[in-house]
A protein has these predicted regions:
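Short, positionally conserved secondary-structure boundary motifs
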Residues: 1-42, 54-57, 67-71, 75-84, ...
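Fold-independent oxyanion-binding glycine-rich loops
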Residues: 51-52, 90
Length: 121
């Protein structure tokens, strides 16, 4: 999960992160958990997101399910013929989230993950 609306010490909903100027992203989110560790995205990492409501199959995206207050980071797989969307973690300890038919209305893609920044020192 990603804490989408975490407030900083001033009570603001935004903060600043030092990042490479070559990263073309609209916002970043801090990762909480290990569901994407197979993609080397670890707890505490910053994920840079480019806003877009659709992403290519196999892309990693930040997704909100059921208007939750947190976003989840998953690999997106969509079968347009069957109208099935699979949100796939990169950790076998977690299950796929599968949506079809009217359930697809529960999904809001915030954007595509375009870069990751680890806090490993």
């Amino acid at each position: 999960m990603i804490r989408k609306f975490e407030k900083n010490e001033n009570g603001d909903r935004r903060d600043y992160v030092m990042a490479d100027v070559a990263i073309e992203a609209d916002f970043c989110l801090k990762v909480s958990g290990d569901s994407m560790k197979g993609a080397r995205i670890l707890d505490g990492d910053m994920v840079f997101i480019r806003k877009q409501d659709r992403v290519e199959n196999g892309s990693i995206a930040a997704v909100v399910v059921n208007n939750d207050s947190e976003a989840t980071l998953r690999r997106i797989h969509y079968n347009s013929e069957k109208r099935v969307l699979i949100l796939k973690p990169e950790n076998p300890a977690y299950e796929d989230l599968i949506f079809s038919g009217d359930e697809l209305n529960q999904i809001h893609i915030l954007g595509k993950a375009v870069a990751f920044q680890s806090n490993i020192k």
